[in-house]
Amino acid sequence: MSTGTVTIDRLGAQGDGVARTEAGPVFAPFTLPGETVSLAVNKANGTLISLKEASPERVEPPCRHFGPDGVNGTCGGCTLQHASDALYHAFKRNLVIDALRSKGLTPEVGALIIARPGDRRRAAFTARRTEKELLLGYNQMQSHHIVSIGECPITSPGIVSRLATIRKIAAAMASSAEPFRITVLETDTGLDLAFEGLKLSDPQRRSAVDAVLGERGIARVSLNGEIVVEPLKPAIDFDGVTVSPPPGAFTQATRPAEDAMAKLVLAHVGKAKRVADLFAGIGTFALRIARTARVHAVEGDDRAVKALDFAARNTQGLKPVTAEKRDLFRRPMMAQELKAFDAVVFDPPRAGAETQCHELARSGVKKIAAVSCNPVTLARDLSILTAAGYRITGVTPIDQFLWSAHVETVATLEK
């Protein structure tokens, strides 16, 4: 461990400031390009001791839990609250540009579709019972310490206003001091609380049920995928199609980002008559596309497939929708199968869709919409498609995780 004064050169891919030193790059959280800072340095990791000269792009963070001096610790939920909007938005867009450029791809990248405070309808908290209280919040940066939060400016008021209720229910379910996870989803009928990492005795189950029934605004509580209590069936609206997500199901974290993605995908699909939606989840795109086209939705999670299928069967005015459970990593749709479609949409996890893209490349499908939460794997997947003759017609970065280093992207291709 050593200390020294350095000048920050740029932002790294994780939102840390990066300083050039004789020993190599040093990564320092909570610093900005152009700043002169004093750091404690351990190998390539720098810890901010003091700010000698601040950047004009530095702003006051809106949350009291953010940064080295955060209340209850340094919350790991955000990394860039101290950056101006202009710097932050450029950083997000450049993540996509740089990833594409690393694969030799130089399409025009559109302006970032921005996120706003309070947009987040899904939040994953860590909790732990202590002798004095129930800690609920986010892990401290690079630590298992829980920063217990009293506010969260990125998260919807519907969740933040019920933090006390969530703590009450969590306290009723927690039986030890072991940490556990709560994913909270704000749905149209109330909060959907998905607990993981707990074991529940019968008395605790009854206590949890009583706690839920004594509160307003809670639609469902589940534990490890099994429903504990469901006063109201959780519901999400996909432009007029109502879906009830299974416990812990993947959903887009914000409704504005989801709407922006859907708008881009629908515009690209256009007048296609048969569309395949791969990694379809609970139907974010498939059920919207079904207003104008026949859709075959493919998803690896059985409960998500059933939720999508039920929604399609119980909504009037949709074209036929078929739903298939299939692990696309192990068994991608083959090129011959894909030839039946006019357009394909794919929205894989962070690992991307490399194997599937090799089949898409051989299929000759006229239009492809690629939705991604990882610019690096997106660039790899797009390079597979462009090598097969596809032309990138649009790239739009979308901010869904405000003040973080995560960015969504919709890329459209034609052949």
From Swiss-Prot:
<feature type="binding site">
    <location>
        <position position="347"/>
    </location>
    <ligand>
        <name>S-adenosyl-L-methionine</name>
    </ligand>
</feature>
<keyword id="KW-0411">Iron-sulfur</keyword>
<protein>
    <recommendedName>
        <fullName>Uncharacterized RNA methyltransferase R00878</fullName>
        <ecNumber>2.1.1.-</ecNumber>
    </recommendedName>
</protein>
<feature type="binding site">
    <location>
        <position position="279"/>
    </location>
    <ligand>
        <name>S-adenosyl-L-methionine</name>
    </ligand>
</feature>
<dbReference type="Pfam" id="PF01938">
    <property type="entry name" value="TRAM"/>
</dbReference>
<keyword id="KW-0408">Iron</keyword>
<dbReference type="GO" id="GO:0070475">
    <property type="term" value="P:rRNA base methylation"/>
</dbReference>
<feature type="binding site">
    <location>
        <position position="152"/>
    </location>
    <ligand>
        <name>[4Fe-4S] cluster</name>
    </ligand>
</feature>
<feature type="binding site">
    <location>
        <position position="252"/>
    </location>
    <ligand>
        <name>S-adenosyl-L-methionine</name>
    </ligand>
</feature>
<comment type="similarity">
    <text>Belongs to the class I-like SAM-binding methyltransferase superfamily. RNA M5U methyltransferase family.</text>
</comment>
<dbReference type="InterPro" id="IPR002792">
    <property type="entry name" value="TRAM_dom"/>
</dbReference>
<feature type="domain" description="TRAM">
    <location>
        <begin position="1"/>
        <end position="55"/>
    </location>
</feature>
<dbReference type="Pfam" id="PF05958">
    <property type="entry name" value="tRNA_U5-meth_tr"/>
</dbReference>
<feature type="binding site">
    <location>
        <position position="78"/>
    </location>
    <ligand>
        <name>[4Fe-4S] cluster</name>
    </ligand>
</feature>
<keyword id="KW-0808">Transferase</keyword>
<dbReference type="GO" id="GO:0051539">
    <property type="term" value="F:4 iron, 4 sulfur cluster binding"/>
</dbReference>
<feature type="binding site">
    <location>
        <position position="75"/>
    </location>
    <ligand>
        <name>[4Fe-4S] cluster</name>
    </ligand>
</feature>
<keyword id="KW-0004">4Fe-4S</keyword>
<feature type="binding site">
    <location>
        <position position="63"/>
    </location>
    <ligand>
        <name>[4Fe-4S] cluster</name>
    </ligand>
</feature>
<dbReference type="GO" id="GO:0046872">
    <property type="term" value="F:metal ion binding"/>
</dbReference>
<dbReference type="InterPro" id="IPR010280">
    <property type="entry name" value="U5_MeTrfase_fam"/>
</dbReference>
<keyword id="KW-0949">S-adenosyl-L-methionine</keyword>
<feature type="active site" description="Nucleophile">
    <location>
        <position position="373"/>
    </location>
</feature>
<dbReference type="InterPro" id="IPR012340">
    <property type="entry name" value="NA-bd_OB-fold"/>
</dbReference>
<keyword id="KW-0479">Metal-binding</keyword>
<dbReference type="InterPro" id="IPR029063">
    <property type="entry name" value="SAM-dependent_MTases_sf"/>
</dbReference>
<dbReference type="GO" id="GO:0070041">
    <property type="term" value="F:rRNA (uridine-C5-)-methyltransferase activity"/>
</dbReference>
<dbReference type="InterPro" id="IPR030390">
    <property type="entry name" value="MeTrfase_TrmA_AS"/>
</dbReference>
<keyword id="KW-0489">Methyltransferase</keyword>
<feature type="binding site">
    <location>
        <position position="299"/>
    </location>
    <ligand>
        <name>S-adenosyl-L-methionine</name>
    </ligand>
</feature>
